[in-house]
């Protein structure tokens, strides 16, 4: 049996612990109980078969292929189940011996292995056992013979093997990723009914009692208990089946191993009921208002606005197939979102620090997360971006703009704190008392002398107090000893000893030590300190995690924020007009202040895992593969703007990646990315500490080699404004000439001394495997699906119904460019009713129009949209041609 999977063996992590529901484990126990019959069989012809079963079921023994083959030669019928009611293939799957399946399939006797064989104990086929127990490796072996398997075979309860795949499980994701669900066809389950309880009025007297009973059953089901044999009835069925059975007044019996989630699964391949929202072009203004109100109505639920946009898009794209309506809806939605978060919406391009405004980072991170989910939903919608390539570019621009808005809000909060918390904040006394040549030394020396004299007097007074206390303690000790000898009271001796200890201990403490032992006062805590910088970066990290923003977008937000902060700090040090920062003493203090930020970065370090299920060839062409076929992509002529792509590097090269246009830059650990951005500042501070000690060109060259991120222009600029200490040597004039010659040789300009501030890198989009791993796996995967609560659905339906009735009451206005009537006319409503609200539509199939009045493949109804010009307004910079390079 040749493998169609090559070497794609998966580690089955579910083997080490129980899998499936409690009922699946009960069925597993029934099969294991049949092993007791093996020792009771006395038929010689069954000896080889029995030994083979014992080999399979012995969990303490490793797989012995040679022994298995020898015993298998003596077995005439590999499908025999007369001994225990269970065949060899069932035992192999139950005990997870996947490697034996191929040997059993290619048995020496030549008998054909029946892969649809049902056991007599539970009534499961091999595929049903593999799915219910989540034996992924067994599934691999079975699918190698997919042409021999009846995938639509049902058990006694009327369920197929597909119905036993637990949703959101690793097995479900594996089958979906490898396109194994293509063998699945829709089968109507004929589920047997049982008679209704006699006293139904007690059970279903009102809606509240039914709801309470349902939740009680769910709680008991989780605990492995039931109220009655019918307690599991229709609790995990689809909503449509559940409502149908409930309306019939009878409970249904389903397979207890069928553990579908109570809420169901969003079907991206079919247009199912309640998974799209009907609307018209005249509903768009009110839908946009509803969209913008969701942060207040549903705070931190970022899947709701994404689901609202996506379900409307599904209706326009798959139901009525109108490309203009899809693109207009997305354009207006993104414009409305961008306008609501833009702190500089009408201010134009950001060119100066004064133009920066502190926006609401909670709202901005909310919409960033919303758009990341919308991007994920559209990627799951097959070939959506190939049908609408302009949508991807617009989505890239909007996500990019919101990231810059969020970074701008953080940066403007940092700008006002850099001077007070980093440049002027000092904790080292020597830095405060340092004398500089440019100061009025006459007055400063007098002040310094007074401070030294005061400090000397304080120390002398402290010594005198210690001597007096010591003298008093000695006298008190002698006095206590005399009283103790006279009275003979041991307790007085202990008391005097305690007093002596207390007095002696007090000698070793002074006010200065006690001041450091106690926490700072509230006044001290309110003063600016480097902790303020840490708090702002911590707030950014918090809101990104709060809204479950994709890690690659989190990394980009933090990276740009640290980069803007580092470049601004670097330029502030070089531009210091008061010459406070350009000195070796202040350089030490600033470096010490930055260590607080370094500690926070180390404590909050994280690394975005690289996508595993994508090769370098496809990754280099991503995200262009979303809108074009691989053969049509030319890497030298990118068709998407403002987006970074993957550039492979040598695996043996462990150097840091400095190129932000390479998407690998953001797959480095956060502390390494921060190190790259902060390196120029750190190296400048190191230069300031050693510059005046250099006395030769050799020492200067070796120092420059150790500081590669600092250019000769910057080195010379720092020395021109350097603040020399009183006894510090001046920077060697020969070294200045050397730097000047270096600048002339390299044709550098002195204007290049400062780093570029507010640099905007390209956007990096997460790949589809990354998003699938993050959003489609795990117990919380249901919360990432584009479902909407009933309140939002009702709001959209009400908007559409009210507008529809208003349009019906208005006189019909014929269109000048088209002889067709308005989409919201009577023909539309009749057409919609004939289609059937409760039917599912396969979006991969071509839907033929049923009448000329409503052509689903035609755009006549949406060639002229009532676009709400006053509802959404883009910022002023969006009309600028240079927006792609620098929207700020």
UniProtKB/Swiss-Prot annotation:
It is found in: Golgi apparatus. Residues 809-823, 867-880 have a biased composition (Polar residues). Residues 360-745 form the Dilute domain. This is Dilute domain-containing protein YPR089W. The keyword Metal-binding does not apply. Keywords: Golgi apparatus. The keyword Metal-binding does not apply. SUPFAM superfamilies: Ankyrin repeat (SSF48403). Present with 3690 molecules/cell in log phase SD medium. GO terms for cellular component: Golgi apparatus. It comes from Saccharomyces cerevisiae (strain ATCC 204508 / S288c) (Baker's yeast). InterPro entries: Ankyrin_rpt-contain_sf, Dilute_dom, Myo5p-like_CBD_DIL, Vascular_dev_regulator. GO terms for molecular function: GTPase binding. Residues 462-504, 805-827, 865-888 are annotated as: Disordered.
């Amino acid at each position: 049996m040749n493998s169609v999977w090559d070497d794609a063996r998966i580690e089955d992590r579910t083997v080490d612990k129980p899998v499936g529901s409690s009922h699946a484990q009960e069925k597993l126990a029934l099969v294991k109980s049949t092993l007791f019959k093996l020792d009771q069989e006395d038929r010689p012809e069954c000896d080889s078969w029995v030994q083979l079963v014992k080999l399979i079921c012995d969990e303490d023994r490793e797989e012995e292929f040679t022994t298995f083959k020898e015993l298998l030669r003596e077995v005439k019928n590999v499908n025999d189940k007369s001994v225990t009611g269970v065949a060899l293939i069932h035992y192999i799957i139950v005990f997870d011996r996947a490697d034996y399946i191929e040997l059993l399939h290619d048995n020496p006797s030549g008998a054909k292995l029946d892969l649809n064989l049902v056991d007599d104990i539970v009534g499961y086929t091999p595929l049903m056992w593999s799915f219910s127990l989540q034996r992924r490796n067994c599934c691999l072996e079975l699918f190698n013979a997919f042409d021999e398997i009846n995938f639509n075979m049902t058990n006694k309860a009327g369920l197929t093997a597909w119905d036993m795949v637990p949703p959101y499980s690793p097995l479900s994701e594996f089958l979906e990723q490898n396109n194994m669900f293509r063998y699945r066809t829709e089968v109507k389950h004929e589920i047997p009914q049982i008679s209704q309880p006699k006293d139904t009025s007690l059970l279903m007297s009102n809606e509240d009692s039914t709801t309470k009973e349902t939740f009680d059953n769910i709680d008991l089901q989780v605990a492995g208990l039931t109220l009655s044999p019918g307690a599991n009835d229709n609790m995990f069925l689809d909503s449509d089946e559940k409502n149908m059975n409930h309306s019939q007044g009878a409970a249904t019996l389903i397979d207890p191993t069928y553990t579908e989630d109570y809420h169901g699964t969003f079907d991206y391949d079919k247009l199912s009921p309640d998974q799209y929202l009907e609307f018209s072009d005249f509903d768009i203004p009110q839908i946009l208002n509803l969209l913008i109100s969701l942060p207040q109505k549903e705070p931190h639920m970022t899947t709701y606005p994404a689901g609202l946009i996506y379900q409307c898009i599904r209706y326009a794209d798959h139901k009525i197939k109108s490309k203009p309506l899809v693109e207009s809806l997305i354009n207006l939605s993104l414009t409305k979102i961008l306008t609501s978060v833009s702190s500089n919406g009408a201010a134009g391009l950001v060119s100066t620090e004064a133009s920066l405004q502190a926006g609401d980072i909670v709202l901005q991170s909310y919409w960033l997360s919303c758009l990341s989910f919308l991007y994920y939903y559209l990627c799951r919608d097959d070939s959506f971006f190939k049908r609408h390539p302009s949508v991807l570019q617009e989505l890239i621009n909007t996500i990019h703009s919101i990231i810059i808005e969020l970074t701008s809000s953080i940066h403007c909060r940092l700008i006002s704190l850099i001077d007070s918390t980093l440049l002027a904040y000092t904790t080292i006394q020597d830095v405060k008392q340092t004398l500089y040549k440019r100061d009025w030394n006459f007055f400063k020396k007098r002040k310094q002398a007074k401070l030294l004299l005061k400090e000397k007097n304080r120390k002398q007074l402290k010594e005198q107090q210690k001597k007096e206390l010591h003298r008093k303690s000695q006298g008190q000790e002698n006095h206590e000893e005399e009283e103790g000898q006279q009275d003979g009271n041991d307790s007085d001796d202990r008391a005097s000893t305690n007093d002596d200890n207390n007095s002696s201990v007090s000698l070793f403490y002074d006010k200065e030590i006690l001041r450091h032992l106690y926490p700072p006062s509230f006044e001290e805590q309110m003063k600016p300190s480097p902790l303020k910088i840490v708090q702002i970066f911590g707030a950014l990290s918090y809101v990104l995690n709060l809204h479950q923003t994709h890690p690659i977008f989190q990394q980009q937000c933090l990276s740009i924020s640290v980069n803007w902060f580092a470049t601004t700090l670097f330029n502030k040090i070089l531009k210091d007009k008061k010459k406070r920062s350009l000195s070796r003493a202040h350089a030490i203090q600033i470096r010490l202040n930055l260590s607080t930020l370094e500690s926070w970065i180390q404590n909050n370090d994280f690394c975005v895992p690289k996508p595993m299920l994508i090769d370098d060839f496809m990754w280099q062409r991503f995200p262009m593969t979303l809108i074009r076929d691989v053969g049509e992509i030319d890497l030298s002529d990118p068709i998407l703007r403002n987006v970074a792509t993957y550039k492979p590097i040598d695996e043996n090269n462990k150097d840091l990646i400095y190129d932000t246009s390479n998407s690998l830059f953001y797959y480095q650990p956060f502390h390494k990315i921060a190190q790259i951005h902060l390196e120029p500042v750190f190296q400048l501070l190191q230069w300031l500490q050693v510059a005046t000690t250099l006395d030769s060109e050799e020492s200067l060259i070796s120092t420059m080699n150790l500081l590669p991120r600092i250019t000769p222009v910057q080195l010379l600029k720092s020395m021109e404004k350097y603040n020399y200490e009183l006894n510090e040597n001046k920077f060697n004039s020969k070294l200045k000439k050397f730097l000047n010659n270096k600048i002339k040789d390299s044709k550098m300009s002195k204007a290049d001394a400062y780093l570029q501030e507010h640099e905007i890198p390209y956007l990096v989009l997460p790949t589809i495997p990354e998003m699938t791993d993050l959003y489609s796996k795990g117990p919380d995967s249901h919360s990432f699906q584009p479902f909407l609560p009933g309140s939002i659905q009702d709001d959209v339906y009400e908007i559409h119904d009210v507008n529809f009735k208003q349009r019906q009451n208005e006189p019909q206005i014929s269109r000048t460019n088209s002889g067709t009537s308005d989409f919201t006319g009577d023909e539309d409503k009749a057409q919609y009713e004939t289609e059937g609200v409760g039917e599912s539509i396969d979006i991969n199939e071509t839907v033929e129009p049923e009448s000329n009045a409503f052509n689903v493949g035609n755009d006549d109804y949406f060639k002229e949209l009532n676009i709400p010009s006053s509802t959404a307004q883009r910022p002023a910079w969006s009309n600028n041609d240079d927006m792609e390079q620098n929207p700020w």
